[in-house]
Amino acid sequence: MGKMKAVEVRAPGGPLQLVERDVPEPAAGQVLIDVRACGICHSDVFTREGLWPGLAFPRVPGHEVVGVIAAVGPGVHEWRPGQRVGVGWHGGHCGRCEPCRRGDFILCRRGLVPGLSYDGGYAERMLAPVEALAQIPDPLSDLEAAPLLCAGITTFNALRNSGARAGEVVAILGIGGLGHLGVQFAAKMGFETVAIARGQDKEPLAKQLGARHYIDSSAQNMAEALTALGGAKLILATVTSGKAMSAALGGLGIDGKLIMVGVSEEPVEVPIAPFIMGRRSVQGWPSGTSMDSQDTLAFSALTGIRPMIEEFPLERAEEAYHRMLSGAARFRVVLKTA
């Protein structure tokens, strides 16, 4: 048994500490991954602060994991050493609960999440169950693929399951870590893409990402601007402000929908009568399965979609985490482990 470097949290609220651990061996139905890159996601706060039910310490965070299979456990026949794989938020499912029996694995009542249910990707090696694995296409580098396994799949999956059709007005509220990918996906899917953010200085970036229209929410009324475009079939809310989401609702067209993928502690206030009379709705969307991740990666490779990233070595995980948490990192932060 060899040794590996890992970054762990030993107690709720504790620092990220670089340690040496024994390399684990894969059990039945598992693979051992040589981790090449792991994205840092805001949801890693759940691990750092001990906010997940049943979370055991010490724990290695990380659920945007890219690497190469180093070994397979007993009974694993579909995967082989040397394959490039990714593991996202969907880290396994039971296959027995009602959502699983209906094929809705992301809502498994006993679902597993890397970095929460078991040790994640802030490490040189990691174990994962085979149902959590996604194939990674060659055109994507390790660093590019990592954020697509959470921020990417969440926005891609929400858009493709929204009911919006090519040519319809789709607005992306916020163009940060999630939103800058959402704008790219929406444009490549053929929607009349509208990017909404604060400040006129963000318009060049929005247009570069593929937006046809830009709304400066600090200077314009979002609802009025969207209505002038005919009303949005979909508003994908990637921001963490319930007030901003509420302010955008008036810009929905008939049968329009607001899908929330950004988490806010503020409530979203819905004007009931206009929603009834216009058949409008509000919905949440929670990531997706490993096959959804694989679809996201394939679509990104095919269409040239790439995340904008900042790279840090594993040894600087604490610094990288705080850069993400403080908002100093504009888009996505990725740890390079190999």
Predicted region positions:
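Helix-to-beta-strand junctions that scaffold the AdoMet/dcAdoMet cofactor pocket
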Residues: L252-G253
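Adenosine-nucleotide cofactor-binding segment
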Residues: V169-I175, A187-A247
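Short N-terminal strand-loop motif that marks the start
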Residues: M1-V66, A128, K336-A338
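NAD(P)H dinucleotide-binding glycine-rich loop of Rossmann-like/cofactor-binding domains
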Residues: E78, G92-L173
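Rossmann-fold dehydrogenase core element
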Residues: K257-I259, V270-E310
